Amino acid sequence: MNNNTLNITNQRTAAAMSQIYFLVVYQTAVMIVSLLGNLFLLFVIFRANQVMKRRVSPVQLLIIHTCVADLLFALLSLGTEILTLRTYPQYYGSNFVCKLMRYVQMFPMYASPFLLVAISADRYQAICRPLAHFRSSRYRRPNWMAAIAWGLALVLSIPQFFVWTKHSKTGRCSTIYGQNKNTVKITYVIMFNTLAWLLPSILAAVFYYCVCKAVRLSSTKSVRAMDSQKRNGKYSSGATEDYIEELRKKSKGFRQQMSEFDRKRVQTVRLTITIVACNFFLWMPFCLINVIQALWPEISHIMFINYVAILGNLNSCLNPWIYILFNRSHVRKALCRSRRSFTEVTKKRSFENFECSSTATMNNNYNNCHAYTAFSNRSQLKFDSYATDSTSLKTNSN
């Protein structure tokens, strides 16, 4: 009987160690990919702006803050968790180190969604309230939003000092309420999932709903204004309107100037919506299972929660690659060998465009000149014939 019990215990220990080994390998891979991706994104942003001789835009500034939050998540959250799993089931740090470790693990998990809300609020301010956006400083508002996000993350992570402790009997760094159902556990779990996942997702969704609504209304108003102008007869004649429209279609610079701003604005909105959606759906299984485990602890197992948390950890890996996918031109510019090569390519393209436009202009002038010469010849013929007729009239009269 004792041998059977010992065998069952050994089997459970071996199964637990294999699961821990899998978690260590997986989290190490996620940490490495997240570090490489976010560092590469920082290089792309700074290098592309350096090549194009531009300052970092407000949206890029907030994305840089998000990259820093993801880097801290990879180093502080995943890195310390890997070290803890390596020494499982013992924890060799002190009680204060246990509390501090759990605090720094939670800090990036609050900072990342708060920064996504800051990006959403910045886009709402720029598109839905453009006058207030241009009156305020271009970089002061994003800096204040980022500072508020970091400050809230620091404050809301403080309960970790009271929830976690190192137990003297087991020697583990675990929560004070354990695995059983507890009022403190339910309150803390619901508070974390509401503040770090649900509330930021709702705020970002509200901001982007207002942004999409404003874009749709502005396009509808522009169409209605054009229709009303046509009805009131404010446009020129049909021939003149067709001529102007044809010139606009032929003008490459006009098309680029009119579409560049709208394209960048829509692209930025799509980028941030994609990042917010990924954050919501990747953390949703972990947050829901965490709440279920707090309310009904007998249903789920702790290792099952660890496996579900795998999806949430992927968020720090996907964010930089989403930005790179939406800004492939920046990546190409950042990967140029030098600024000189990029400048030479730009000058070459500009020279080719200038040459083509100059050729077209010369052809245009030549055609106009040819038309004017033909018109002058016809006028000269008419004048000569008129002069001949006048001479003959004078001769007849004499």
Swiss-Prot record:
Localisation per UniProt entry: Cell membrane
UniProt topological domain (Cytoplasmic) ranges: 47-58, 121-143, 209-271, 326-398
Transmembrane segments: 26-46, 59-79, 100-120, 144-164, 188-208, 272-292, 303-325
Main location: membrane
Disulfide pattern: C98-C173
Extracellular face of the membrane: 1-25, 80-99, 165-187, 293-302
Carbohydrate attachment residues: N3, N7
GO molecular function, one term: G protein-coupled receptor activity
This protein's GO CC annotations: membrane; plasma membrane
Topology term for the membrane: Multi-pass membrane protein
Phenotype caused by lack of the gene: Viable and fertile. Males have reduced reproductive success, due to a range of aberrant mating behaviors. Double knockouts with ntr-1 partially rescue the reproductive phenotypes.
Pfam family, one: 7tm_1
Tissue: Detected in the ADL sensory neurons, the RMED and RMEV motor neurons, and the PQR tail neuron. In males, detected in SPC tail neurons involved in spicule penetration and sperm transfer, and male-specific oblique muscles involved in vulval contact.
InterPro entries: GPCR_Rhodpsn (IPR000276), GPCR_Rhodpsn_7TM (IPR017452), Neuropeptide-GPCR (IPR052665)
Keywords assigned: Behavior, Cell membrane, Disulfide bond, G-protein coupled receptor, Glycoprotein, Membrane, Receptor, Transducer, Transmembrane, Transmembrane helix
Protein name as catalogued: Nematocin receptor 2
Source lineage: Eukaryota, Metazoa, Ecdysozoa, Nematoda, Chromadorea
